[in-house]
Amino acid sequence: MMEEIDRFQDPAAASISDRDCDAREEKQRELARKGSLKNGSMGSPVNQQPKKNNVMARTRLVVPNKGYSSLDQSPDEKPLVALDTDSDDDFDMSRYSSSGYSSAEQINQDLNIQLLKDGYRLDEIPDDEDLDLIPPKSVNPTCMCCQATSSTACHIQ
């Protein structure tokens, strides 16, 4: 630790350390040059042109046909979604025919029947207005004036 402090204070020691750094940098540059010569590349990697053997052969490129035949399904593949079903019991469209507003009335009646089956009678029971008029409970049950005085009796003026 003391040697480092002395080196920074002594100009002769500082010049020696600068020479050491310069020598190290020069060694690194030489090693980099030798490595680039071994690889067959000269100069910076930015200026290098790509080699011809880096390009993929034309026979290996996959180009789709114009007819998009890849979209056709082979017989062994199954579709993701089956649209045709045999059962018509799920939803009966004949009840909801488009014959004017009578179909809307039919739907409304069906909804009312379903609500009654489920036990909801929201449209038949009127709202109780007394429920809306309940005052909120007070947070502090005592009077504010009682807390301010030290007496046990509370007097409101």
From Swiss-Prot:
InterPro entries: FAM219. The modification N-acetylmethionine is found at residue 1. The modification Phosphothreonine is found at residue 85. Residues 94-103 have a biased composition (Low complexity). Keywords: Acetylation, Phosphoprotein. Disulfide bonds: none annotated. The modification Phosphoserine is found at residues 44, 74, 87, 94. Pfam families: FAM219A. Residues 17-33 have a biased composition (Basic and acidic residues). Residues 38-52 have a biased composition (Polar residues). Residues 1-103 are annotated as: Disordered. Belongs to the FAM219 family. This is Protein FAM219A. It comes from Mus musculus.
